[in-house]
């Protein structure tokens, strides 16, 4: 409901202008609106809004902080200028004072608190840095920082990540436009169910969890006429639809379990 309000009433064009993105169910802004609409008593108690890693940094340093890459996925950040969007904060009914200070990922936010240093038996000179979102951090680790560099990551979800020196927005908003390292930006497509599809199929349906044996059987197959749409948790890219559902297509009486296993793998690929 909150995503529909943002995308349809506020409008995708305005959202994209404010934040370089449109509303997805996983983003923070629609969640804030949900709390505002459903739990106004809790909304009134909000002092600071932080992402999980930022809360850990706060506990270690006492500093309310976030970084540009992770904050990009909140739908509250003016990604182009790497600062909070006043328009989005107003739409959500929160103030900049309720938000954490935005840092570049590599920046030091402070030193570890003395009491934490004592408890963990580490020097008080240990620095706490802002950090990064998972895909942005992985991209730095794989060298996906230079202009035009790309990586593909398959885990529970699947992502295609493209680094760019220049700010740009996908005209269809099918890709996320986020801040990246070294003052760069990145475009990212996120498929919500990737390797998790294979895990679901093997453990819940096949019931063996014997991936190696199933892979060996698939190697004997050729062209497969069974197709699988891997929308087990809705979808983000290229179709923003939380209600999308997974489907097998093209099944006949001759369809085997191995055909369906191959379809699951090919559907993700």
Predicted regions and their residues:
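Short linear loop/turn motifs
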Residues: 100-108, 215-218
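Active-site core segments that coordinate phosphate-bearing ligands/cofactors
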Residues: 4-64, 75-86, 90-93, 114-269
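Nucleotide/phosphate-binding loop and acidic/charged catalytic motifs
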Residues: 67-71
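General small-molecule cofactor/ligand-binding pocket signal
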Residues: 97-103, 127-129
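A charged helix-plus-loop insertion that forms the helical arch/lid used to bind
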Residues: 1
């Amino acid at each position: 409901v909150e995503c529909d309000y943002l995308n349809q009433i506020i409008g995708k064009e305005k959202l994209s202008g404010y934040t370089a993105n449109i509303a997805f169910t996983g983003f923070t802004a629609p969640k804030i609106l949900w709390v505002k609409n459903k739990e106004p008593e809790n909304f009134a108690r909000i002092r600071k809004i932080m992402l999980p890693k930022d809360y850990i940094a706060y506990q270690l340093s006492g500093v309310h902080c976030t970084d540009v890459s992770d904050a990009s996925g909140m739908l509250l950040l003016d990604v182009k200028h790497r600062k909070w969007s006043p328009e989005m904060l107003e739409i959500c009914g929160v103030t900049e004072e309720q938000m954490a200070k935005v840092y570049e990922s590599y920046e030091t936010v402070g030193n570890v608190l003395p009491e934490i240093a004592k408890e963990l038996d580490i020097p008080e000179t240990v620095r706490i840095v802002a950090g990064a979102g998972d895909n942005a951090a992985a991209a730095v680790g794989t060298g996906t920082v230079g202009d035009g560099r790309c990586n593909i990551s398959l885990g529970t979800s699947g992502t295609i990540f493209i680094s760019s020196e220049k700010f740009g927005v996908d005209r269809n908003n099918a890709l996320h436009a986020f801040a990246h390292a070294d003052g760069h930006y990145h475009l990212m497509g996120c498929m919500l169910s990737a390797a998790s599809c294979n895990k679901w199929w093997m453990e819940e349906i096949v019931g063996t969890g014997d991936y190696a044996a199933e892979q060996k059987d698939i190697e004997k197959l050729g062209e497969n006429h069974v197709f699988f749409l891997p929308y087990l948790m809705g979808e983000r890219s290229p179709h923003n639809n939380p209600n999308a559902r997974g489907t097998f297509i093209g099944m006949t009486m001759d369809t085997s379990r191995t055909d369906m296993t191959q379809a699951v793998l090919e559907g993700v690929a």
